[in-house]
């Protein structure tokens, strides 16, 4: 008999600027994870021996993020030695994939309770430092039609007719919503402040929000991907997308996701496991999906992934109350919203990665914490969480409050 996978809680760290002068540079990735594991245990007086596994997404699992950080963090946090650990990478989908895997484990009856989430310290373990043939081997570059993601985003904007002012307006709204959400206390429930080993505060709120951002200031920024386009990457796109004559380069640092540090975890379990632990479920995971998409444009995967999840759940886009569509670049959520004909009023209502940053392996789990809190605050029922994924993939998860 298939079990229902419930979400009992979801918490995250604030996002710190992913540079050496960022507030979380002093905090190692295992420290960020340790803080959340300890917080989860203390919040619920959780008997950690009831947890079967810790599954963490991490896009760059080398250096300080290597050696199966999930298992080592569980030991470091003082959890029961019976708690196993798994680190996985599905590029930017890793944090949400961890939650989906945890749900599958619970639904199958293989495990009863799992902590799932992700971590990425981009200031200490730089993006791409794990290498990989996809972008380092010229033969594989050609075979996989490798193009920098920003050019993929610019291609989406070109195909959809999103202008520079359109994507800048979206970015401006991301900052406005994030600033308003923090000012209104919407993040207070799920964000766990990060202190150092001596208990000194390092960061208690997302560090990269710029409340005064506007279309006029963003207009002064130069597009980031004109030069790589001239190096031959635009030609790769134009060979595959013959309906356009040129790529309109509209994305820049101000309307793209920021490089940040952070971690997030969710507690997922069966009804019986929750009852045994004295926990009350907040939501259930209704359906999840992953799918491959065209690899050159790379960032259109959310649409087919969401459609796949909706079809399997017997639902329609109109059944979803709130959407979290990762803001890798402004054109990505704009494209998905356009494909499903949904209002941006219900998309990323408290800001997103353009304003608060994209800590790669942690982002999917962070989106889960955000939308779960907001469903409860608005007394709504259903949410879709989705991300575009490197290599041309999409991931989607549908949750429902209980």
What are these regions (language model features)?
Residues 58-112, 144-151, 219-258, 339-366, ...:
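Conserved catalytic cysteine-centered active-site region
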């Amino acid at each position: 008999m298939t079990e229902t996978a419930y979400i009992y809680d979801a918490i995250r760290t604030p996002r710190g600027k992913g540079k050496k002068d960022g507030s979380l540079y002093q905090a190692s990735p295992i420290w960020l994870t340790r803080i959340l594991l300890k917080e989860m245990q203390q919040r619920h007086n959780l008997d950690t021996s009831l947890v079967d596994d810790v599954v963490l997404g991490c896009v760059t699992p080398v250096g300080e993020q290597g050696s199966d950080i999930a298992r080592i963090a569980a030991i470091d946090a003082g959890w029961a030695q019976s708690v196993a650990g798994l680190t996985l990478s599905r590029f930017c989908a890793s944090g949400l994939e961890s939650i989906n895997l945890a749900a599958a484990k619970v639904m199958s009856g293989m495990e009863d309770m799992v902590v799932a989430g992700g971590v990425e310290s981009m200031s200490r373990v730089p993006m791409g430092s794990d290498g990989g043939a996809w972008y380092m081997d010229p033969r594989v570059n050609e075979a996989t039609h490798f193009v920098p993601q920003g050019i993929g985003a610019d291609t989406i904007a070109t195909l959809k007719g999103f202008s520079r002012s359109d994507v800048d307006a979206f970015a401006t709204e991301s900052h406005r919503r994030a600033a308003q959400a923090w000012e209104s206390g919407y993040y207070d429930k799920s964000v766990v402040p990060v202190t150092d080993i001596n208990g000194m505060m390092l960061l208690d709120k997302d560090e990269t929000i710029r409340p005064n951002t506007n279309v006029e200031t963003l207009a002064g920024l130069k597009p980031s991907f004109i030069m790589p386009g001239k190096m031959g990457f635009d030609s790769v796109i134009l060979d595959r997308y013959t309906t356009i004559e040129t790529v309109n380069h509209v994305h820049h640092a101000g309307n793209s996701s920021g490089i940040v540090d952070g971690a997030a975890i969710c507690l997922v379990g069966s009804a019986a496991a929750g009852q045994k632990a004295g926990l009350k479920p907040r939501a259930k995971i209704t359906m999840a999906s992953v799918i491959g998409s065209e690899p050159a444009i790379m960032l259109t995967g959310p649409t087919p992934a969401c459609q796949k999840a909706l079809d399997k759940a017997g639902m329609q886009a109109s059944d979803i109350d709130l959407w979290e569509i990762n803001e890798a670049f402004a054109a990505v959520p704009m494209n998905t919203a356009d494909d499903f004909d949904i209002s941006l009023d219900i998309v990323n209502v408290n800001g997103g990665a353009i304003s608060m940053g994209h800590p790669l392996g942690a982002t999917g789990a962070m989106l889960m914490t955000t939308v779960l809190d907001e469903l409860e605050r608005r007394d709504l029922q259903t949410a879709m969480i989705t991300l575009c994924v490197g290599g041309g993939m999409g991931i989607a998860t549908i949750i429902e409050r209980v």
